[in-house]
Amino acid sequence: MISIINKIISLILVPIYFSVLSPTYPIIYLFNQPKELISLYENGVGSEEDPVYLTAHRGVNALAPENSLPSFEEAVKNGYYSAECDIQLTKDNRWVVIHNAEVDGRFCEYGRIEDLTLKELKTFSYNWGPNVWKYKDSRIPTLEEYLDVFVGTQTRPQIEIGIENYDKLDNIVNAITQRGLTKQAIVLTYNLKQLQAIHDLNPEIELWYLVDEMTPEAIAQAKAIGDNVWLSASYDKNTEENIKLAMSENINFSLFTVNTVEEAKALYDMGVRYIETDILCN
């Protein structure tokens, strides 16, 4: 059950909060306006023959609340290469799509995911994010609901495991394979043991090793797991030297998070073709 404190917050304090804030609703509306996507093609970066393969960070979070089903649907609609999500595990061992380990003010609810059942989480609605008023009936998705968005599409689901868990990884693999997404889905994590475990469960699933910097050690660790293991590295932490190292080692990689045309062009000119973004499109 939701804790007594959480009930007090949800049933008493939140309504008071919004009644006090009601005069400022125009400001809230202003802060939740969608942002216009910035086209790389229109700014001379990439082409249909040699494109940048873009990952939508937590879905297209410029047009819909991050990690919501509408944000992933926008990724498919706008032709993104992949759409990244984050998953956490509920009290009743269901994988759900949310970045933080707890629900927060974006849902006007509070509590740790690991302390809440799926049924309890499904009572929470989005109350913050681009176009939120259009998606007032949206709920935190399950992993299965997220994956269903990509069945029969060209956009790849990209699943980041957000917690240190090993005994429920088979549920992730099963959800992927049951939908025929084995060759389409990507699983990524900072945890090498989780990557190895996923690889052992199904070596056909593509894995991305999340790292800050692309070092010789990180490259060797990824290669040790298998041929279909990429690096997903921080754009801010990697120099041209790091990029050249990865290329010379023949390891595939993607850089996050790139949000300006200038950054994307500089990377493109260096030969980088895979980036993650909040705002760019082709």
Question: Can you say where each PLM-predicted feature lies in the sequence?
Answer:
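Phosphate-group recognition and catalysis centered on beta-loop-alpha active-site segments
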Residues: I2-N282
